[in-house]
């Protein structure tokens, strides 16, 4: 195998993963958010010039609705083009202010007025104008939308592709179990058309699932008569009638097969088939060989056959028999009498030529096209009287106009493919040559001119009858070739189109007035319906979800979701087993592992790592080409339909050095089956072993050793991991951690290469390489502002930390700063913990987890959660609410954290119940209690007309205030605190801009210096003509005076001029940007109606790990912390090192997730190698020895492994730096389905000088005694999940009651009580605890008088109770009375 050396970037050199993969990667992991980003980019086509836009997205929607003509046709509104403006607020400002991030859409339309008087269409005048059509939400670069200040994701939908589908009822409709076949034409929008057989083999049709009609009615409405229908669907046998006796059949031998004749079949004198014998294929061959053209048959052979045409007496014109009649003896006699010499009959038999259409015609009541149209009208609009025009229009609008019916390009492609046509393109309406030829409007003439003699509806019925006849197969609805993905862009386009159609109706009404009243396009178009439709879709559609933002992985997974639910999709209740099941076509397209547990199982899926959608929306997966057994590196993407024709080998098929398949029989997949094929018959091969799984499943190491159900839990639980205080890379990973972190957008990556110029906790400044600097005003400085301590959707903390130092040389794409759950640019969801598998005093019973106190002490699982609390001051009927520190009846101590405006200080530590924002509400006059009267008498009026409605810290929460935002309505004066916040914000922005400008300026001057030093000058400040410009001279000059230099060299002179222009341009630009920012900060805020002021307070809550918190590994091994034990009591190793976590060994065998054991072994080896490197560094070993040891770790089995690590690229200093980063453990990658083998794990343990069994002797921390046997010990990456006991634990003494039942509310959110439910009542009944039970049902619950009295009694020290009537009983009595049953209680 050739050595595959990769060159390492600045970031990658810091820490290298040892990769155990045997397969070299053909494809890099693609951009993981492409499905979202690309789809929306196509929808907007923002960076495409208007005249070059493709027929997609907004452009397509606008083109499909415009031009709009008035009813009279004298005025029309035409579409010219559109452009998107600049968003008013950027993403950060939208999040802060609770706005939606979007840009205004301006559409250019042209109003054309035609001259009424002229006979031809002469244009009277034209007016072109730009019309505002509302805000279009913009996607952030991470594939999300910001709607009302929160990040949302539009999930892609997997729905049934438009086209035609053939199916049967699986024998469920009829008691006999007969299969009833059906066909359904599903358009992209418009009416569904179904065809179905009934148990008597007649064909029916339904429109939009209404009542069924015989299919001949539909064909008659299209303009076919009985003879034409029969000719389309049947082959005709021709009989010549002899004038006196007998009949001659024009013989087609094939058609006789399977019949039994009651006369001898002879060729001349030679009998071929005797009477009563069945005719076989051999007989047919003999007949063909004999060349028999006509066959004399008796009359009764013709009787009972079905006529294919009307029979008319030639002389009198009398109708002797109708098409589709069964010929009787009388009719045959009449034919002879009238001198009819030939008749045609339908060739039918019971086996494979059923008389279905013939049966249908017998039950069809209609005779003419008009009758058929009326019948369809009655079915669609029952109870309305039909007129000829109405019936014709209704039928035409159902399937034949683009306004009402659209198959779409996908639908047409699928339709043509299924009915066996070669061409892919076609009309997006149903086309029928005969129907359109009879109409004479422009559109119909165009269609007829462009198309061949085809009929879509006839062809579907033909395929359906063929399937019924036993030729052809039905479709599998769950095949991914019949389901397609609808992404954001397409859904937004549909919604936009719906809005436009609503606008179109209104415009049509107004267009008639446009001419007389001289209206402009702006007055004609009302943008509200479009804006409303879009807002509704992004804000409250079923597929617009609140983004799951627990950690970077959950963001990426959420955007790669594919849901079968949603508008036009399935519903949970109706979805059966088949839809939810794994289908062979899921391979490489949709993850076979990751799906939710519960009611949505199988309906919500995740895209596989390499999957993408093609132009039609079908999922494709990449394969390597194989030619004559040689595997090439050419990659082809195949959809599920295309894949059907090929034999595909697995990714791990054995190949030799020349890439030839070596096995005699290769395990392959073909048409959904697994089989063995010789190498010559293989067409394709998988690109990667992780092709079948999604991102989350591909992050589970040793996935191949886990049971599928546990792997599913493992993949799902990784998404719930909370980012810890200090992230730790997993010691055992799979090698795609870096790709996930990169694409999730939580890290800061360098846009261009360069040198780090300046850095602090919140900002990184890069001076860009000369080569990467663009022209114009680009000054070559990139400034990255980091996100500090902001709140995610799940209240976890988002914070970015710089990874670089001043002077570091970086390249494009390098990681400059880590985000939440990332460690040097790699995904790091949990912590590497030292784990022992052993029982410990019952503390790990039933998956419980025993923790060491050291874990808590070192803050390994301490997480920061940020809570947002909002206080709103409204205008009430009694006057405005007021935010102030002057609150009645509140102690001085309770207000000591508030400033004079009544808002809490930043940095204050608050506990449950503390006031954070003081607010008073005016209250109406009420009956005063004697105490209040006394107070009034003493203190005067003021004390009682306001009540305290301050924002307090909710129960069970304490933390530190980290940010306060005050929003004030426009036109209301800002308070002191708001002004302070505003000033500090303006200061911050100014400093940012000043720094940026200073750095830009310095960069421009530095570049200019390099261009003019050493050149000859023609003069300048203190410089003679002919002198050279030197560094010293420039240092002595004021920067602004450099521009007075006059250079001899033209290039140098140009450079000075260019630099001056650049600096002036930047100065202007910065001033404008600062003015804009300042304006936004100082302007009033757009608040909800009736809101005067809003204060948002952000609390940072620190949560340590504690009993009751849920934790999990990556293999579905989840548990709850049962106890935290002192370090000295934990089991310890011979070295004296205590373990961190003790897990129950019984959790492994029955769950069959052995991956965790292998992870523990390999993790131990990784840690051991790190310790060995640490010892070498401490002993100051020679660099060459360290290099040799690292080479041994990374490349010892490079004969079988794919990638080698080239350590010669590292300088000694870089190597030492790498060594320092490996002290914590050498990270390993064992890719999914291609991971480390047992031998390799043992080899690593050996290198680390650890026992190869992976087990060691542990000692009891309490007694110091050795345990009876050795224990499996090692490092596992363990996660803390977002199911924290602090969020779930809840207690209440007094609190809110429900008004009707007078019982406490339920649930933590309502601060509710504990329900003493029916099972608890049964328990007390069973014990006979009558008094306790009475107390529970009355005074402790809803007996109002009793509980008030009880309170007084306790205060007075009398411990007795009087139980009265529970309020819920009164409610019951009232409900019974509402049923008009009187019920009274008697003493």
Curated annotation (Swiss-Prot):
PROSITE patterns: RNA_POL_BETA. GO terms for molecular function: DNA binding; DNA-directed RNA polymerase activity; ribonucleoside binding. It catalyses: RNA(n) + a ribonucleoside 5'-triphosphate = RNA(n+1) + diphosphate. The keyword Mitochondrion does not apply. One of its GO terms (biological process) is DNA-templated transcription. Keywords: DNA-directed RNA polymerase, Nucleotidyltransferase, Transcription, Transferase. It comes from the Bacteria. It is an enzyme of class 2 (transferase). InterPro entries: DNA-dir_RNA_pol_bsu_ext_1_sf, DNA-dir_RNA_pol_bsu_external_1, DNA-dir_RNA_pol_su2, DNA-dir_RNAP_su2_dom, DNA-dir_RNAP_su2_hyb_sf, RNA_pol_bsu_bac, RNA_pol_bsu_CS, RNA_pol_bsu_protrusion. HAMAP family: RNApol_bact_RpoB. DNA-dependent RNA polymerase catalyzes the transcription of DNA into RNA using the four ribonucleoside triphosphates as substrates. This is DNA-directed RNA polymerase subunit beta. The gene is rpoB.
């Amino acid at each position: 195998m050739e050595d595959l050396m990769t060159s390492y970037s600045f970031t990658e050199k810091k820490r290298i993963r040892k990769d155990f993969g045997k397969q070299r990667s053909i494809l890099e992991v693609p951009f993981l958010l492409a499905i979202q980003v690309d789809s929306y980019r196509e929808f907007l086509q923002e960076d495409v010039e208007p005249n070059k836009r493709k027929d997609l997205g907004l452009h397509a929607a606008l083109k499909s609705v415009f031009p709009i003509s008035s009813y009279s046709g004298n005025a029309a509104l035409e579409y010219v083009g559109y452009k998107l403006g600049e968003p008013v607020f950027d993403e950060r400002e939208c999040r802060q202010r609770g706005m939606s991030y979007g840009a205004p859409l301006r559409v250019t339309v042209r109003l054309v007025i035609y001259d009424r008087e002229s006979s031809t269409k002469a244009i009277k005048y034209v007016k072109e104008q730009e019309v505002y059509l509302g805000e279009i939400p913009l996607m952030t670069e991470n594939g999300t939308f910001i709607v009302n200040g929160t990040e949302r994701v539009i999930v892609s939908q997997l729905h049934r592709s438009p086209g035609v589908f053939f199916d049967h009822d699986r024998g469920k409709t009829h008691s006999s179990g007969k299969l009833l076949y059906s066909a359904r034409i599903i358009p992209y929008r418009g009416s569904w058309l179904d065809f179905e057989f009934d148990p008597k083999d007649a064909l029916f049709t339904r429109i939009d699932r209404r009542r069924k009609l015989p299919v001949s009615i539909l064909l008659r409405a299209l303009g076919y008569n009985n003879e034409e229908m029969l000719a389309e669907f049947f082959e005709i046998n021709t009989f010549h009638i002899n004038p006196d006796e007998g009949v001659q059949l024009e013989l087609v031998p094939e058609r006789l097969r399977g019949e039994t004749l009651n006369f001898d079949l002879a060729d001349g004198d030679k009998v071929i088939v005797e009477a009563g014998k069945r005719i076989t294929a051999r007989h047919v061959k003999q007949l063909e060989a004999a060349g028999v053209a006509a066959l004399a048959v008796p009359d009764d052979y013709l009787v009972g056959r079905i006529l294919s045409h009307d029979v008319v007496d030639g002389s009198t014109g009398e109708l002797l028999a109708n098409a589709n009649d069964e010929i009787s003896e009388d009719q045959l006699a009449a034919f002879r009498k009238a001198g009819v010499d030939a008749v045609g009959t339908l060739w039918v038999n019971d086996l494979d030529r059923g008389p279905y259409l013939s049966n249908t015609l017998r039950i069809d009541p209609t005779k003419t096209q008009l009758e058929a149209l009326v019948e369809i009208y009655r079915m669609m609009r029952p109870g309305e009287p039909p007129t000829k025009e109405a019936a014709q229009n209704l039928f035409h609008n159902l399937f034949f106009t683009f306004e009402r019916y659209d198959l779409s390009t996908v639908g047409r492609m699928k339709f043509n493919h299924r009915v066996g046509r070669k061409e892919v393109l076609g009309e997006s309406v149903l086309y029928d040559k005969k129907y359109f030829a009879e109409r004479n409007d422009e559109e119909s003439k165009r269609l007829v001119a462009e198309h061949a003699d085809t009929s879509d509806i006839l062809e579907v019925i033909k395929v359906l009858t063929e399937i019924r006849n036993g030729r052809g197969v039905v479709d599998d609805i769950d095949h991914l070739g019949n389901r397609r993905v609808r992404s954001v862009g397409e859904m937004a386009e549909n919604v936009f189109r719906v809005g436009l159609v609503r606008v179109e109706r209104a415009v049509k009404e107004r267009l008639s007035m446009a001419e007389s009243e001289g209206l402009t396009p702006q007055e004609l178009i009302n943008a509200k319906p479009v804006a409303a439709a879009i807002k509704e879709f992004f804000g409250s559609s079923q597929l617009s979800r609140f983004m799951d933002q627990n950690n970077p992985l959950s963001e990426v997974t959420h955007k790669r979701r594919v849901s079968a639910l949603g508008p036009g999709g399935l519903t949970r209740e109706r979805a059966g087993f088949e839809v939810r099941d794994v289908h062979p076509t899921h391979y490489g397209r949709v993850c076979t592992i990751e799906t939710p547990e519960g009611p949505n199982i199988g309906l919500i899926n995740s895209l596989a790592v390499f999957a993408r959608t093609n132009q039609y929306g079908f999922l494709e997966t990449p394969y390597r080409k194989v030619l004559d057994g040689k595997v090439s590196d050419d990659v082809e993407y195949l959809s599920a339909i295309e894949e059907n024709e090929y034999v595909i080998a697995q990714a791990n098929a054995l190949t030799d050095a020349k890439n030839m398949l070596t096995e005699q029989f290769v395990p392959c997949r073909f048409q959904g089956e697994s089989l063995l094929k010789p190498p010559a018959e293989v067409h394709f091969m998988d690109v990667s072993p992780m092709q079948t799984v999604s991102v989350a499943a591909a992050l589970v190491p040793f996935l191949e050793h886990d049971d599928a159900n546990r792997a599913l839990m493992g993949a799902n639980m990784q998404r719930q991991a909370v980012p810890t205080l200090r992230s730790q890379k997993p010691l055992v990973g799979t090698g795609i951690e870096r790709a996930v972190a990169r694409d999730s957008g939580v890290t800061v990556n360098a846009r261009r290469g360069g040198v780090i110029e300046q850095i602090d906790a919140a900002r990184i400044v890069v001076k860009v390489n000369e080569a990467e600097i663009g022209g114009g005003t680009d000054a070559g400085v990139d400034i990255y502002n980091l996100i500090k301590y902001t709140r995610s959707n799940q209240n976890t903390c988002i914070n970015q930390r710089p990874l670089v130092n001043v002077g570091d040389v970086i390249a494009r794409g390098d990681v400059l700063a880590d985000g939440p759950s990332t460690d040097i640019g790699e995904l790091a969801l949990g912590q590497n913990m030292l784990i022992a598998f052993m029982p410990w005093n019952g503390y790990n019973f039933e998956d419980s987890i025993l923790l060491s106190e050291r874990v808590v002490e070192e803050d390994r699982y301490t997480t920061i959660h940020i809570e947002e609390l909002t206080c709103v001051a409204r205008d009430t009927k009694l006057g405005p609410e007021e935010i102030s520190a002057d609150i009645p009846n509140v102690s001085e101590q309770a207000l000591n954290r508030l400033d004079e405006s009544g808002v809490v200080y930043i940095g204050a530590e608050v506990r449950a119940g503390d006031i954070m924002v003081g607010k008073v509400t005016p209250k109406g006059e009420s009956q005063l209690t004697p105490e209040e009267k006394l107070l009034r008498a003493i203190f005067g009026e003021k004390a009682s007309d306001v009540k305290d409605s301050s924002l307090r810290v909710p129960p069970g929460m304490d933390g530190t205030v980290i940010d306060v935002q005050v929003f004030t309505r426009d036109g209301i004066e800002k308070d002191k605190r708001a002004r302070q916040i505003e000033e500090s914000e303006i200061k911050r922005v100014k400093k940012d801009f000043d720094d940026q400008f200073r750095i830009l300026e310095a960069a421009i001057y530095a570049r200019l210096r390099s261009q003019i030093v050493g050149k000859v000058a023609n003069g300048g400040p203190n410089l003679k003509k002919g002198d050279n410009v030197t560094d010293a001279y420039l240092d002595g000059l004021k920067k602004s005076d450099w521009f007075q230099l006059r250079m001899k060299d033209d290039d140098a002179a140009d450079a000075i001029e260019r630099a001056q222009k650049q600096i002036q341009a930047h100065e202007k630009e910065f001033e404008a940007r600062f003015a804009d920012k300042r304006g936004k900060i100082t302007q009033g805020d757009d608040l909800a109606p009736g809101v005067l002021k809003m204060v948002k307070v952000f609390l940072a809550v620190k949560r340590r790990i504690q009993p009751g918190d849920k934790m999990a590994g990556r293999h579905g091994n989840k548990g709850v912390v049962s106890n935290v034990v002192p370090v000295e009591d934990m089991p310890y190793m011979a070295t004296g090192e205590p373990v961190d976590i003790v897990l129950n060994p019984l959790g492994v065998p029955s769950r069959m997730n052995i991956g965790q054991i292998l992870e523990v072994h390999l993790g131990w080896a990784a840690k051991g190698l790190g310790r060995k490197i640490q010892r070498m560094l401490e002993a100051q070993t020679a660099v060459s020895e360290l290099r040799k040891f690292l080479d041994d770790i990374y490349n010892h089995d490079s004969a079988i492994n794919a990638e080698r690590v080239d350590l010669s690229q590292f300088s000694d200093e870089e190597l030492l730096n790498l060594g320092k980063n490996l002290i914590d453990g050498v990270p390993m990658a064992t890719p999914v389905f291609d991971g480390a083998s047992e031998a390799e794990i043992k080899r690593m343990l050996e290198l680390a000088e650890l026992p190869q069994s992976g087990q060691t002797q542990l000692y009891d921390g309490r007694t110091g005694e050795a345990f009876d046997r050795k224990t499996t010990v090692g490092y596992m990456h363990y996660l803390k999940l977002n199911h924290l006991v602090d969020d779930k634990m809840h207690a209440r003494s007094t609190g809110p009651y429900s008004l009707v039942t007078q019982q406490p509310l339920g649930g933590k959110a309502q601060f509710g009580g504990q329900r003493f439910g029916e099972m608890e009542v049964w328990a007390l009944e069973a014990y006979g605890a009558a008094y306790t039970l009475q107390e529970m049902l009355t005074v402790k619950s809803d007996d109002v008088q009793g509980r008030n009295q009880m309170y007084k009694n306790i205060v007075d020290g009398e411990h007795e109770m009087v139980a009265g009537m529970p309020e819920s009983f009164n409610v019951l009595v009232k409900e019974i009375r509402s049923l008009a049953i009187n019920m009274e209680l008697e003493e």
